[in-house]
């Protein structure tokens, strides 16, 4: 049973998958999307679902700090609804407040990554953090 974690933005979707036991999350890739052109990367996502034999999605939900749902969270929920419909797999949501900030801080402090390098991996690392937080919260 593998779970796929997604960090959905307006231009990219960071993708992570769990190990078979559901203990750890690993970053896979960043899928380029374009909301304005309604290109959401579903074809590539489908390839990854098959390759990793995914049984569930976890989509990051970027709530506001006061716990309200804003436009980005609504867009993430719409993305979740669409992938649930397309792939006929369950979708859970994980609060992702500050995960991108945490990911950026990690890359600066631990990896000493340049701004250009951080930009290339930040969404994938955020997807890992979203999925790992979900796995930790739902461990048996």
UniProtKB/Swiss-Prot annotation:
<dbReference type="InterPro" id="IPR037027">
    <property type="entry name" value="YqgF/RNaseH-like_dom_sf"/>
</dbReference>
<dbReference type="GO" id="GO:0000967">
    <property type="term" value="P:rRNA 5'-end processing"/>
</dbReference>
<keyword id="KW-0378">Hydrolase</keyword>
<comment type="similarity">
    <text>Belongs to the YqgF nuclease family.</text>
</comment>
<dbReference type="Pfam" id="PF03652">
    <property type="entry name" value="RuvX"/>
</dbReference>
<dbReference type="GO" id="GO:0004518">
    <property type="term" value="F:nuclease activity"/>
</dbReference>
<dbReference type="InterPro" id="IPR012337">
    <property type="entry name" value="RNaseH-like_sf"/>
</dbReference>
<comment type="function">
    <text>Could be a nuclease involved in processing of the 5'-end of pre-16S rRNA.</text>
</comment>
<dbReference type="InterPro" id="IPR005227">
    <property type="entry name" value="YqgF"/>
</dbReference>
<keyword id="KW-0540">Nuclease</keyword>
<dbReference type="GO" id="GO:0005829">
    <property type="term" value="C:cytosol"/>
</dbReference>
<keyword id="KW-0690">Ribosome biogenesis</keyword>
<dbReference type="InterPro" id="IPR006641">
    <property type="entry name" value="YqgF/RNaseH-like_dom"/>
</dbReference>
<keyword id="KW-0963">Cytoplasm</keyword>
<protein>
    <recommendedName>
        <fullName>Putative pre-16S rRNA nuclease</fullName>
        <ecNumber>3.1.-.-</ecNumber>
    </recommendedName>
</protein>
């Amino acid at each position: 049973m593998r779970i796929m974690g997604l960090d959905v933005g307006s231009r990219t979707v960071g993708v992570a998958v769990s190990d078979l036991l559901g203990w750890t999350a690993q970053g896979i890739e960043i899928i380029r999307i374009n909301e304005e052109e309604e290109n959401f990367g579903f074809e590539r996502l489908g390839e990854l679902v098959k390759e990793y034999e995914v049984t569930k999605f976890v989509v990051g939900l970027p709530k506001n700090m006061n716990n309200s749902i804003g436009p980005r969270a609504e867009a993430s929920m719409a993305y979740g609804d669409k992938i649930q419909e397309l792939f006929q797999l369950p979708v859970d949501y994980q609060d992702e407040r500050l995960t991108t900030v945490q990911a950026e801080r990690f890359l600066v402090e631990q990896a000493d990554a340049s701004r250009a390098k951080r930009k290339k991996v930040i969404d994938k690392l955020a997807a890992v953090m979203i999925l790992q937080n979900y796995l930790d919260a739902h461990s048996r």
